[in-house]
Structure formats: C-alpha cells, structure tokens
Amino acid sequence: DWQACADHGVLGSMVAGEFGGRDRSLASTLLTLEGLGHGCTDNGLTFAVASQILSTQLVLERFGTDAQQRRWLPGLVDGSLIGAFAMTELESGSDAFSLTATAEERPDGGYRLNGHKAYITFGPVCDLCVVFASTRPGAGAWGVSAFFVPTDLPGVHRGDVRSKMGMRTTPFGDLELADVDLPPESLIGRPGAGASIFSSIIDVERSFIFAPQVGAMQRQLEATIEFARTREQGGHPIARYQAVAHRIAAMKERHEAARLFLYRAALAEARGDRLTMAASLAKIVACDAGIASSMDAAVVNGARGYLPEFEVERQLRDAMGGLVYSGSTDVLRNVVARLLGVG
C-alpha cells in the first residue's frame, strides 16, 4: 500500500538524505518504479506513487527554496503527506497555458488565488498542491506563475473522488480555489516562471510516468505465457497454435520497445540533453504498447480476459488512461512532428 511504499523508501528515492530520502538518480528511480510495477498488481497505486515523485516532489527538489523543502519534503517522503499537481482546468487541457485561474498580488507581496482545477490526481485527498495560475491575465504562458498551496487554507475545497474507467484506486477529482490568501513564500521561483517550471517537470514526468506500466507489462507477459502453456484445446496447449504464439511474441516486442524508449529517455536526462523529443517518444511508445498488449492478453485468455474478477480486464482499462494523462498521445505526435520540422 501507500505507506509500505514510503516505509521501503520508494517515495523518497530521489530526495536528499537530509529530508529522509535515498538520494538516488532519476535513472535509479526509473528502475525502482519499473520493479514496483512488476511486483504490485495495483496499477492505480503504482501510477499514484510515480505521479507524486515525478511532479510535486520534483518541483520541490528542483525549484523549492530550502524553507519550502524542509517544510514539505519530509512528510511527502514518509507518507504522512500527499502531494498533487494542479495545472489542468475544465477548458484548459492540451492548451496548457490558457488558464482561467488567477493569482492577484496583494500589497504585502502575497497572492489571492481564485479558480477551478479539474481532473487532478490526488485532488480529493492531497495535503499540498502545486497550483499554476495566471498572475498577468492575457499574457499567456509568460503570465503563468506556480505556487505551493496547502489544502487546509481557507478557501481551498477538495472535490469528491470521481469515478473513472481505470486506475480506480487512485483518488481523482477537482479543486475549488475561492479567495485563497497565500503568503509571499508560497510562490515557486519568480513571478511568471510557471511555464518554464511546468515544461521542465512535464518532460521528466512524460519520460518516466510509464515506468510502472513497463513493469506491469512484464508481469502481464509472464502470466499470459503461463496461461497459454497450461490451457489446452484440441489436445494441445494453446501456446502451440501460431495465432496465440504470435500474439505473445508481439507482446514481447512491445514490452522491449517500451522499456528501451524509457531507458533512452533516462540516458538523455543523465547527459543533460533536452528531453522533449525523448519524453514524447517514450510516452507514445509505452502507451500504445500497453494498450495493444493488454488487448492481446485479453484475447489469449478468452472469456477470462473479459471478466472483471481476473486481472486481464483491469489491465486494459488501466492502460487506456495513458492516452490522456501527462499529455495526450495525439498531441505528443504533433510535438514530435514539430521537432522534426514537419508540423
């Protein structure tokens, strides 16, 4: 469960030891998340762990002041606090910086925050939220700033947990922000730095958010092979039929491709390269691989693959979310095309 992930050091993998973390590299954390995905059958939990590590905590590690880090990182690492990352709004999704949430500067240097954030992982249960809002309405990306917002402040309302197709164990919902008064120290970086902060974090998140799913794909492949070897039809294990064997071979191909694209992104990050291309490709390949392989696993399992009491059906539902979160696959193909000079 969540607390077990904290107790075993997973949540603090990249956090400095002075805050209770393990001080490991992003590449090492990728391997940790992949192993977690292989060993844990709760894909919602593994996604939630990766989400907090690669968003809220990463913002604190890279952009937080010493005071901000000391206030929040120990609790996030030991599991006593939960962090969320609130960029999306009802009318602001792929067009990320078309925000209606505003943060008006007060005479004392603080800010008054108003707006509605939608579809937020951990939104209904978070203790701390990284909120993006416009401090210069009409200035687009250049007017966006980022804030650390404790959810126990007056005016912060956490919405109900929303039902969704997959990853149902991850709380997901909205945040209402009504005249929330923030002290000056809530600002992350400088005013107007929100777009650069978001772009830096989202490239890392896209690169590695599928690490648990790559581990889950390995588990899925192993289970499908075992089923195909033991399930007999026509006097033979179904693994001996070419149609079944080819589906399993394709699952292996996709798993290796997804893993290699994630590792390639990790190498790019370690070198200090710009991540946008590697991140986009890693997410596209891993997402498509997860969906296609889940469909193949469902077909090989026959009726079992269509029933909710078996893991196969849940894996397919869970995989579908990847088409949307951390940047839709279609939009990321536009990003790749633009970087190639054809979009």
Task: Show the residue positions of the predicted features.
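Short Gly/Pro-enriched turn/cap motifs at secondary-structure boundaries
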Residues: 91-94, 119-122, 136-138, 164-171
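A structural signal for short hydrophobic beta-strand segments in well-ordered beta-sheet cores
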Residues: 101-104
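Flexible, small-/acidic-enriched active-site or ligand-binding loops
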Residues: 98, 152-183
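A short core secondary-structure module
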Residues: 110, 114-158
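A short, charged helix-loop
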Residues: 173-200
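Helix-loop "lid/cap" segments that line or gate small-molecule binding pockets
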Residues: 54-63
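A short, Trp-centered hydrophobic/proline-enriched beta-strand micro-motif
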Residues: 78-87
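Alpha-helical interface subdomain recognition
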Residues: 1-40, 49, 63-68, 75, ...
